[in-house]
Amino acid sequence: MDLARSDIIPHLLCLFQEIIQANIQKVSEAYDLELKIMNILTLWRNGSDNLISDNDDYMKKGLFFSRSNDPLALQARYAQMYDDLFKLNNYKVPDDVVRKHDTKILDIILKESSVPFWYDISDDEAHESMLPEFRLQDIHEFRLNLKRVAVVPDESEEIQMDESQSDKRRRKKRMEKSRPVWLSGSENDRRIELNDSLKPSQKFETKLSSYLLNRLMNEMNPHYCGHPLPALFVTLIMLKAYSLKNKFFSYGIRYMELVCNEIGGPDLNTRTFPVLFGSDGSFVGTRVYSHYPIKLRMILNDLTYLLTYSDLHKFQEFELDVNDEVLLHMLHSPNDGRQLKKAVTRLNLYYGLKFNPKTTDCGVVNGMDFTHKHPITKTADFTSPVLPMTNSFNKAEICYGHSSKILNRAVFTDTVRGYIREDLKNVADLDLPKLHEHVSKLVDMRVNYTIIYDLMFLRVMLNLGGYSRSNQITDFRKTIDEITKMNEDFLSGADPEKNIDILNAWMAPTMEDCGYRLTKSILFGKFRKAKYPSDLEAKSNIDYYVTARSAGIGNLRISIETDKRKYKVRTTSKSAFVNAMGSGILDVNPVSNEPMMLTDYLLTQTPETRANLEAAIDSGSISDSELMRILGQNSIGSRSTTAWRPVRPIYINVLQAHLAQAFIIGPHINATVNQHESQPTSLWFTGDDLGVGFATLYQNGTADIIAPAIEASSTGKALSVLADCSSWDQTFLTATIIPYYNGIKKALLEYQQADMRNFYMIDSSRTGVPGMKLSEIVDWFNSFQTKRIFNASYLKERHSFVVKYMWSGRLDTFFMNSVQNALITRRIAEEVSLKVSNTGLSWFQVAGDDAIMVYDGSSISTTEQVTRVNEITVRNYEESNHIINPQKTVISHISGEYAKIYYYAGMHFRDPSIQLHESEKDSGASDVTESLRGFGQVIYEYNKRAIGTLRVNALYGRLIAGLAYSVNVRRYDASKRTYANMKYYPPPTSVIAPAAFKGGLGLSFTGLSLNEVLFIKMHLHEAVSQGLHVISMISFEANEVVSNSLSAYYLKDQKDLLRDMKLGKHLEKVKGISFKSSDLAFSGSDFSQGLNLKRESIDKVKLEVSRKSIRDLRSSGISVPSTHAYENLPYASLHQSFKSLKVDRDTSKFTNERLLVSLLEYKSDIPRVSVTSQYPVYDLINISKVDELNVRSGGPVRFISTPIEGKLLEENIGTRQGVQFKNRGYGGSQEVLHFIRSNGLVITEQALIDLIIKSGVLLMINPQRGLIDLFQSLSGDTASSMHLANFFMAEKPHWEDNAISLTIAGSLLENCDSRIENVKNFVSVLATGMQKDLQRMFYYVGFVYYAQRLIWSGGHSSKIFVSIDEDKLADFLRGSKPITRRRKAMAGTKREPINLSANFSYEISEPDREISEYDPLVLCHPLSMPFFGNWQEKYSVMQSDEQM
C-alpha cells in the first residue's frame, strides 16, 4: 500500500470531502477520487500487496490478492482492521467526548460477563421467543484459545498424495485435538425435551448446547452480502467526512473498542470483536457471549441510518444524544426492543393531533416549528361519494392557514389524550429522558414536514434491530393457540350475542350472492381480461398458475451427471416442479386424505399396523413428507419482519389446491386486478359491479392508489377511519368463505356450458372417470378447506395446528380478505350514517386486511361523535370474529396509515423499514454478480426513501458493493491441479458498468436510476471504458450449462428446434438425472412427464390456425422463428423452466478463471470498450446545449420521505398530478401481458415487441393482417390475436410509454409531474421534422438526464437541448427491420435517400394508409428495448410473477 497506515484516515477524509463538494462540472474528477478511495479501501481490506500494482492496470484489469490460509495472519489482519476502526472513531475527538458514556458502556460489558452460562439456562428460558442472553466461555479460556489458533497446523499442508485411509483418520484426530473449543462447561450439558407432533411420543430430546447454538446461528444471522467490518469502516469515515469538522463520534464503536480491550487483553493481535463472518458475509459464529452478533448488527444499522437519514438530525447535538441514549439502552438490553416499540405505539399513531394556540402561531416555539405550510387540494370534495375510474392526484397548492378548527378539536378525544399520556409515562419509566423529550414533540399539531421528520427519526431508532428473528414455534403457539380457542368458542356459539350463526345470517347470503354475480358477469364476458379457460387452455397455462408468489412446495433436489462433471441443483421453482410431476400435479388424490393429528390417526389403526408405523417413524424409514401426506397435513413457513416484531407464520398451500383455486376463483382475481373498464356506479362490490374498494383496481406502484385519502387529509374537512385488525387470516373463518365458493358453483351450474366436457383435474381414486369438472373442483376444494392441519418446524421441533380459517399461502387470500373487509366496511358505513348525524361515507378502500374509510366531516363537531364512530367500527369487526384493537383504530382528519403508506396533512411518507445491509434470508443467487445486482436493487430502493443526501447515499452504496465484489479464482499447474487460490476484484468501474456487460452491476451514480448509460457516456466514459473489456469476461456459466444441456437432452428428437434455439458452446452431454423432493405431492418423476403434459395440452384447432398463419407469412417473405411457433410451445416452455434452475454455489461460484488469471501475464494494451456498444440507441443522442433555468414550480412538496435531491426535483418540476404516463410499475402493457398470459406463452413482452419489429410485418401492405397472423402463429388463438393487433394499430401514440415507465417508474421522478407538457419546460429536442411520438421519447430521455444533472448541481435547474444524429438514426431504423419482398416491390428498385428533416413516407395502394420510416417506432419502437431502466431483468416483476 503506497500510503502509510497512519495516513489513510486523513487522506480518505480529504478525498470524501472533495467528492461531497464537487458539482456537475467536476463529475469526472469526483469519480476519479471515488476510484482512488475504492483502491485504498480494497488494499486496506485485504491486508497484502496486490499482484497488479500499476494504477492503469488496476483500472483495466482489477486487483488480485493471494488468499492466505494462515490463521495467525488472518487474525492479525482483522485485529489491525479493528484497530484502524477504533482509531478512526477517536480521530480528532476530544477525550472527554470519547469517554462521555464509558460508565454506561462498562456497565453493559459487566452485565455481559455476569449473565448465566449457557448450561444455566432453564428449559423454559431456552424455549422463550427471544433467545436468552448467555455466556459461551469465560474470557480467560477464550484468550487461551486465541493463542492456540496460532499453532493449529494447516490441514492442507499435511495432505499427502499417497495418504492412506488410516493416515487420514489419524490426521483428522490430531486436528480435532489441537482445534480450540469455544464452548466451556461441556460436562454440564444436559438434554432438554422438545415437542414433536410427528412422533408417536409427541416429543424428543436433544442436547441443550446444540439447541441453544442452533438458535444462535439462526436468529443472530444477518445474512450480509459482504463482511461487516469494511462496512463499519466506510460508514464511519463517511459520517466523519460529512459531519461538522469531522467531529462525529460513535458510542457503538466505542462499545466495540472497550469489548475488544476487555476480552482481547494487551496483545493487539487478539483484540478483535468476537463475531465471525466469511468474506461473503456468511455468519460463522460468535465467541464468549451470545448476543454480540445482534449488538454488532445494531451498531452497523445505527451508523447506516445516521448517514443515510442525515437530514433528520443534521448532526445536531440533541438528536445525536437521543440516538446515543436509545442505542446504549438496546446494547444494555438487546432483547427489550419489543418493549421499547410497545412503549411508543400510540404516539406512533396519534402524533400531531393536539390542536392548541401554538398550532396557529405560525412560527418557532421552544425549538419546534409550527409554521403552517403543507400541500392542499382545494378541489377535493368529499361531501358525496367519490367514484374514480383511476385514482390520481389533483393540482395541489401550498396551504398557509387553518380552516377546519372544529374537526381539530373533535378528533382529539379524552381517550386519545389518555393514550398519549400513558405512552409518555412508558418512555419515562424506561429511564430514557432524551427520548422522552423527543417524543413529547410529537403530541402537538404541526402542519408542516418537521413533525414527519421527528416521527421518522423515532421510527429509524425502532428499526435498529434489523430483521427480528425468534423461536417461531413459541411465537406461533402463542398466537395460533389463543386464536384457535377464540375461533372454537365463536363456532360453538358460546357467546349468544357473537357467534357464527349470527354472523352468517347476513354474511353467508351476501358472500354467496357476490360469488354468484361475479361468476355470471365473467361468464357473460363483462370483464374482458377475466374468463374461465377451457381445460386445454388451463393446462397449457399451468406455468403461469404456479408463479413465484403462488403455492409453496418442498425443495426439489436434482442431481445431473454430464460427461464432464456432476451438478447438484436444489430449487423451489414451481415451474420445474410442475414439469417434473407432469399430469400428476393435477391429481387431487395424494392430498385428499382427511387431516388428522398423528395421535388420532394411530388410534384408527390396528395394533399391528400401529406398531409398524410407530417403528417406521422412530427409525426414520418413513420420510416426513410421506408421513404428512398420510396424515393430510401441510407445512407452515415463516417470515421475519423488522422493528422486533415476532416471526409470522406463512401457511403453505399444496400445488393441487392452488391449481384448483386458479381454475375456479382465478378469474375473479383477474377481474379485480385491472383498472376499471367503465365508470363505477357505486362504492360497493356486488359482483355485478366492482365498486371502488379493491386496492388492486388502482395499483400502479405509486401513491396514486390512495390519492383521495391523502387529498382528504390536506383539507382537514373529511374524517378518515383506519381499522387495524390483528391476525386477520386466522380469524377469517372458513365457514364464512365457503358460501362465496357455493355462489361460484351455483352460477357454473346455471351456465352449464362452462361445466361440461372440460376436465381440469383428476382424482385417481375414482376409476373410469375422465376427470373433474369445475363444479366438482368447487366441491372438492370446499371439502379441502373446511379443516386443515398445518405443521410448523423449527430446529427439528415440530408442532401441528388445526386450521379452520383462511391460510396465508392460498391464491385467494388477498382477494377474499378484501371481499370480506369490503362487506364489513359497508355494514359500518350504513350504521354510521344511521347513528352519527347522517354522516356519509365518501370513499373507501381495502387491501386484504387493511381498510381505510373517508367520511364527509361536515356534520362532525364533537368528540362524542368521533368516539361513536370508533365504537361502531370496532364492534362490527369484533362481531365478524376479528381481533381489532380500539387503541389502534385511528380516526383523524389529518393523518393516516394504510398498506404501509403514511400521510399527514396532504404529505406522503414511508416507514424506514427497508434494511440496507441485512436480508431476511440468504440470497438465492448462485454467483456474486447476480447477488450484488440484487443488492444494488436494494440500495436503489433504500435510497429513494432515505431522508439524506442522495449523492452521499449513492456513493455509500457503491463503495459497499465494490468492497463485496470479489471472485475466488484458482490457478492450475500443468496437471490441471489447483496450486494457488486468489481473490480477484474486478475493475472498480464494474460497480456502475451497466448490467448488459456480464460483470457489470449497473449501480446508480446519480441515485436516480440504474444502468445510467447516457450519464456515463456524457461524463464518465473515459474511466468506465477502460475496464469494460475485462468486465465482460466475468461470467458464471454453470447455470447456463445445466439449462442448455437439459434442453438438448430432453429435446434431442427436435433437431431443427434445437438448432434454432442456438444453445451455443455451453453444452455438455447429460448421462443421468435423479430427483428427490421433500414435498408430499412428489412421488418420483422426470421432466419428460411435464413435456408430455404440455404436448397433450396442444389444441388441434389452434395448431392448424398457427400453421396456416405461418404459411401465409412465409408467402410474404416473413419467417416466424420455430422457437416461438405454437406447436413448439411445450418445448419452449420446458427450456424456459430449465433456466430457473440454480446450481449449488460450490459449483457455480467460479467464473472463467483461466481468462482472468491470464490478466496477470497479459502485457499488451487492453482495448477500450464503449458503454454504448451494448446500448446502441445512445449513439443517436447528444446533449448539444445546457442553459441555466432560474425558475421553480413554486408548488408544494408532497413526498416527504425522499432524499434532499428528491424534494428539489419535486420543487423544480412540480409535484405529481393528473394521469401520468401509463405506468404499470415495471414498464409493461397490460394488453400484451394479457395476450401472453392467457395463451400460456413463454415469450417475454420485450421479445414479442422485438419480434414484431424484426419480422417486418409492419411493412406489409396490410400490416394489421400481418400482426394477426404473427400473433396467431404464436398462440393459435384468433380472438386474442385480433384484439392485440387492433390494440397495436389503435394505440400507436402510446408505445413510447413502455420505455418511459422503464425509466421513470420506481424512480424519484415518479413523485414529479412527468407529463409531456410539463417536461417540455425543461427539455428541448432539436428535431422539428421528426414524428411527434418519436420526438416525445427523446424528450423523456432528456428529462431523465435533466434530473441527473440537477442532482449533481445542488438543485440548480437547467434546460436540456437534445440533438439526434440523423445519419445514425437512419442506419438504426434500417437495421431494425428487414426489407421483405413485398416491401421491395412496393418501394421499387430506385429509392431516394431518407429525408429525416421531413416526415418522409411512401404512398401505397391501400386507401388512406401510408408507411413511414418511423412506423416501427410509432407502433413499438426499438427504444423500448432494455437500454435503460430501474429494474434489473432478474429482479423486475415479470409476467410470470403477476398475481392471477
UniProtKB/Swiss-Prot annotation:
UniProt-annotated stretches for the region Disordered: 157-181
Mutation effect (residue 1332 to R): In strain: Isolate H
CC annotations in GO: host cell cytoplasm; virion component
Catalysed reaction, written as an equation: RNA(n) + a ribonucleoside 5'-triphosphate = RNA(n+1) + diphosphate
UniProt EC number: 2.7.7.48
Subcellular location: Virion; Host cytoplasm
PROSITE patterns: RDRP_DSRNA_REO
Keywords of this entry: Host cytoplasm, Nucleotide-binding, Nucleotidyltransferase, RNA-directed RNA polymerase, Transferase, Viral RNA replication, Virion
Domain of life according to the entry: Viruses
GO terms for biological process, alphabetical: viral genome replication
Stated role: RNA-directed RNA polymerase that is involved in both transcription and genome replication. Together with the capping enzyme P5 and protein P7, forms an enzyme complex positioned near the channels situated at each of the five-fold vertices of the core.
Family: Belongs to the reoviridae RNA-directed RNA polymerase family.
Protein name: RNA-directed RNA polymerase P1
